[in-house]
Swiss-Prot record:
It comes from Pseudomonas fluorescens (strain Pf0-1). This is Protease HtpX. It is a multi-pass membrane protein. HAMAP family: Pept_M48_protease_HtpX. InterPro entries: HtpX_protease, Pept_M48_protease_HtpX, Peptidase_M48. Its main location: membrane. The keyword Hydrolase applies. The active site is at residue 148. Binds 1 zinc ion per subunit. GO terms for molecular function: metalloendopeptidase activity; zinc ion binding.
Length: 295
């Protein structure tokens, strides 16, 4: 909770500074001179409220959504040796990472994958695919689990949700400025907000939203390297490298993980060219090289 409060305080300061900066550069005067009467400070606060509300709401329901979207079955009473080992391993890794034991689950998927989610590092969920348990060696599965525990211990779910809140705020803010400019300056509408405002605002939100998602994914890729480093500390560098090499060998298999969980999975798939900007994970080769340099 302290992380959320500190981050919100920081971003309120960012909103305030942005508002002051726009005023100092005469942006209000420029808009008014062109017939656009906007209170930028009020607009910025309005966008911040709605931008963060959606992001934080998604964070708070993330465990429930993950269970529903993947069909994850939570292990309460282990019925097999695999389930018993899984619970014991997660408990041990959590203790070493200094967090409370998360919920542990298995989701039905052939591809080797895993994810972690939850609004709080002491109220999280770690789940692995059936395919991962069946085909990977125990030390490789342990490394994957250590990677996911690393996400939880590092507070990555909260961090990315708050970063998403920031970009949501500015996407909404600038989209509405563009919408007003198009409506009042280009189409010369003087009676409220015309159709041009709504069309331009929606179009601007789509374009700016795509650009903003590249920023969020950049942060996500940086967090993956940190989670790999945590996995190497908890399970051993060799085991972490072996797990990533096994994942690389299976990259041809289709990924059935929902896009909303990809940022916190172990395997984010492959994209080429311009689409690489929107990858939630760095290429596996880069992650393996980073671990080798770690030694």
């Amino acid at each position: 909770m302290m992380r959320i409060l500190l981050f919100l305080a920081t971003n309120l300061a960012v909103v305030l500074i942005a508002s002051i900066t726009l005023s100092l550069f005469g942006f209000n005067g420029f808009m008014a001179a062109n017939g656009v009467d906007l209170n930028l400070s009020q607009l910025l606060v309005f966008c911040a409220v709605f931008g963060f509300a959606g992001s934080l709401f998604s964070l708070f329901i993330s465990k429930w959504m993950a269970k529903m979207s993947t069909g994850t079955q939570i292990i309460t009473q282990p019925r097999t040796r695999h389930e018993q080992w899984l619970l014991q391993t997660v408990e041990q890794l959590s203790r070493e990472a200094g967090i409370k034991m998360p919920e542990v689950g298995i989701f039905p998927a052939y591809e080797a994958n895993a994810f972690a989610t939850g609004w709080n590092k002491n109220d999280a969920l770690v789940a692995v695919s059936q395919g991962l348990l069946e085909r990977f060696k125990e030390d490789e599965v342990r490394a994957v689990l250590a990677h996911e525990i690393g996400h939880v211990a590092n507070g990555d779910m909260v961090t990315l949700a708050l970063i998403q809140g920031v970009v949501n705020t500015f996407v909404m803010f600038f989209a509405r400025i563009i919408g007003n400019f198009v409506d009042k300056v280009i189409f010369k509408n003087e009676e409220g907000q015309g159709m041009a405002y709504y069309i331009a605002t929606i179009f601007a939100e789509l374009v700016l939203g795509i650009l903003a998602s590249a920023i969020v994914m950049w942060f996500s890729r940086k967090r993956e390297f940190r989670a790999d480093d945590a996995g190497a500390r908890l399970a051993g560098t060799g085991a972490m490298i072996n797990a990533l090499q096994r994942l690389r060998a299976e990259q041809g298999l289709p990924v059935h993980m929902p896009d909303t969980l990809n940022a916190f999975g172990i395997n984010g798939g492959i994209k080429q060219g311009f689409a690489r900007m929107f990858m939630s994970h760095p290429p596996l080769e880069e992650r393996i090289d980073a671990l080798r340099r770690r030694g």
